[in-house]
């Protein structure tokens, strides 16, 4: 039997992750008391060979050694894989302000920021054992769904997942990027009145940028760079690499370049595109 454990700080997207696993055929159980986890595994019908549970601060012991001991004992019985979700504290606070929910640790007379900091410490024993950690700070529900499905379902392509991100320097910088390319030197469609309302995914902007040699050269140079580097990253057992492309507002140039690069690499690699300036967050 395979047991997937979804954990992470409150507001990081665990419920969404469980819904994805349910769609993939997992028997999902939310909020299992930690002390009953071993008993649950012993009583699960053997036919249910794929089980997923969520573990959060509400159902964990305060003694970290108990967490380590139980996880180790479970791994002797079944295949256990931990997926840990998190986001920067400022984003978690924003999500809480929208839902107006109380943090589970707020009953200890802690502020929300203090509760999140304590929660981070208490969950660290689980985080350290995670096979996959996902930062959901700027992920849409669709992107989180896609990231989990690629990880769990596998692919006939290379195991390396390439994440192309577009962003605007005047907005948010991608803290999770491995490589960042600044394309603000490229011709800017923003200064063309007829193009301002479009994005780098729309044909008028694509035609404008495709008509400039420097844009084509830039894309080719980035493409050639990673055609050379990616095999070495694979040899070092990298699971994914994040390549961020930034322009001023994250609407035109960076979106176009990210889309073009993704199209070039998707034949051989698993590819995901995240346009931080265009989409809603979790």
Swiss-Prot record:
Belongs to the RapZ-like family. InterPro entries: P-loop_NTPase, RapZ-like, RapZ-like_N, RapZ_C. One of its GO terms (molecular function) is ATP binding. NCBIfam families: PRK05416.1. GTP binds at residues 56-59. The lineage of its organism: Bacteria, Pseudomonadati, Pseudomonadota, Gammaproteobacteria, Alteromonadales. SUPFAM superfamilies: P-loop containing nucleoside triphosphate hydrolases (SSF52540). ATP binds at residues 8-15. This is Nucleotide-binding protein Ping_2894. Displays ATPase and GTPase activities. Keywords: ATP-binding, GTP-binding, Nucleotide-binding. It comes from the Bacteria.
């Amino acid at each position: 039997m395979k047991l997937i454990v979804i954990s992470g700080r409150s507001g990081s997207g665990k419920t969404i992750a469980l819904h994805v696993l349910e769609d993939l055929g997992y028997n999902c159980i939310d909020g299992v008391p930690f002390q009953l986890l071993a008993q649950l595994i012993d009583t699960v019908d053997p036919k249910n060979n794929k089980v997923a549970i969520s573990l959060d601060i509400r159902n964990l012991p305060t003694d970290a050694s108990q967490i380590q001991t139980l996880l180790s004992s479970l791994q002797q019985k079944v295949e256990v894989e931990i997926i840990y979700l998190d986001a920067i504290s400022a984003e978690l606070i924003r999500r809480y302000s929208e839902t107006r929910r109380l943090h589970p640790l707020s009953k200890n007379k802690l502020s929300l920021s203090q509760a999140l900091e304590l929660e981070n410490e208490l969950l660290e024993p689980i985080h350290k054992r995670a096979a996959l950690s996902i930062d959901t700070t700027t992920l849409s529900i669709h992107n989180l769904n896609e990231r989990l499905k690629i990880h769990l379902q596998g692919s006939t392509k290379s195991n390396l997942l390439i994440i192309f991100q577009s962003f605007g320097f005047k907005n948010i910088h991608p803290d999770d990027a491995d490589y960042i390319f600044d394309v603000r030197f490229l011709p800017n469609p923003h200064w063309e009145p007829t193009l301002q309302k479009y994005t780098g995914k729309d044909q008028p902007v694509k035609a404008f940028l495709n008509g400039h040699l420097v844009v084509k050269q830039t894309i080719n140079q980035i493409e050639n760079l990673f055609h050379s580097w990616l095999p070495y990253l694979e040899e070092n057992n990298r699971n994914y690499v994040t390549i961020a492309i930034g322009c001023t507002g994250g609407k035109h140039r960076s979106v176009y370049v990210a889309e073009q690069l993704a199209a070039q690499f998707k034949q051989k690699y698993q590819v995901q595109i995240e346009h931080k300036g265009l989409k809603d967050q979790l």
